[in-house]
Amino acid sequence: MKVMVYEPGHPGELREIDNTLAACQEVVDGYIETMHLTGELLIVCNEEGRLYNLPRNRLGICGTFFVCTAAGEDFDGLSDSQVEYLRKTVR
C-alpha cells in the first residue's frame, strides 16, 4: 500500500509497504497506535514513542510515523490527491 512516511528531521517520503501488521510495526519500530488526521486519513505511529523518548517529530508525535487511509477495519493506501494534500500540509 502507498503511504507517506515521516521520520524525525526528514521530509515526508512516499513508500510502498506491505499491508501487514509486521510491515507497519517495522516502519514505526514498535507496536502501532492509530489516530485520525482527517476524516479519511490515519496516522500510524509507535504507541510507546514517548515512553522510549524517541525523537520528537511533526504533530507532537515521537518517532517515525506514516499516514494511510482506512478500508473498514483494515489499512489502505493513499490516492494521488491525498499524497499531494499531505505534501502541502504536513511539513
Describe every region a protein language model picked out.
Residues M1-R91:
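Short beta-rich binding modules
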